[in-house]
């Protein structure tokens, strides 16, 4: 079981640091096998917004971007990412920034055009093993804000080696209950607003293996837009738990499993036949 320490502390926040928390869990039989930071070491990276894009005069695959980073003047940054668009918000490594692997960003010229900074992908920041193009940030990200603060990257992923008798701790809720008992801290169960489902459609279900599955519950949900991106905060919670984003429907079910321990699966209603 791998999880974000910040996620756990949303449920229960004992007055101890990461090392003390890991010791408490291990002594309680929930052996901590690994603790690792959720992102690579980097500094001086902020939220930027691409204001304009022009073709590079001497390189077909490069483009010259004017980028706002919350200062009086925008920065000119040469970029080769295929997905850069006007208006998008992206991580910007300022001149003097240090990225994972020891790369230091300097003011330079690319094919004769000055470039003052670097637009970053998720992999260049240690947030993904690989990535295609720039990391797109949410539209509500504040231009100029430090990226580590915006993404709350001062966090650790904790991995537990659970024994078969502790299946109750295969989720944040179960681990939080255990930590609450160990530290005598109150567990704060998140308040979730009830969502009204208006669909009147249903699908008959037949349980053919009642001994193994005595009860099955499903619900038809219509009007789901699978073209939208999963919210970045949910993508980050999944990533810090060892899962990658696979689209909003799968991500929501995986998130519920990790937080509450309730297995779920989303089916395409149009492809279901029978019951």
Model-derived regions, located:
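Phosphate-backbone binding interfaces of nucleic-acid-interacting proteins
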Residues: 1-199
């Amino acid at each position: 079981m791998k999880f974000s320490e910040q996620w756990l502390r949303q449920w229960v926040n004992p007055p101890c640091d990461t090392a003390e928390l890991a010791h408490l869990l291990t002594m309680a039989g929930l052996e901590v096998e690994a603790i690792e930071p959720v992102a690579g070491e980097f500094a001086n990276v902020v939220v930027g917004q691409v204001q304009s894009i022009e073709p590079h005069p001497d390189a077909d695959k490069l483009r010259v971007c004017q980028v706002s980073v919350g200062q009086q003047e925008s920065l000119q940054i040469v970029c080769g990412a295929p997905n850069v668009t006007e208006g998008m918000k992206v991580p910007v490594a300022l001149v003097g920034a240090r990225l994972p692997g020891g790369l230091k960003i300097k003011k330079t010229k690319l094919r004769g055009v000055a470039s003052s900074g670097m637009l970053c992908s998720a992999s260049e920041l240690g947030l993904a093993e690989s990535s295609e193009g720039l990391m797109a940030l949410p539209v509500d990200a504040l231009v100029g804000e430090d990226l580590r603060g915006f993404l709350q990257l001062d966090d650790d992923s904790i991995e537990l080696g659970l024994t078969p008798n502790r299946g109750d701790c295969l989720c944040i809720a179960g681990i939080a209950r255990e930590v609450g008992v160990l530290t005598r801290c109150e567990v704060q169960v998140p308040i979730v607003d009830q969502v009204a489902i208006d669909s009147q459609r249903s699908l008959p279900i037949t349980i053919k293996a009642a001994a193994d599955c005595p009860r099955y519950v499903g619900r038809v949900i219509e009007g789901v837009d699978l073209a939208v991106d999963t919210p970045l905060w949910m993508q980050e919670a999944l990533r810090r738990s060892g899962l990658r984003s696979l689209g909003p429907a799968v991500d929501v079910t995986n998130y519920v499993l990790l937080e509450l321990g309730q297995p779920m699966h989303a089916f395409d209603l149009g492809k279901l036949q029978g019951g």
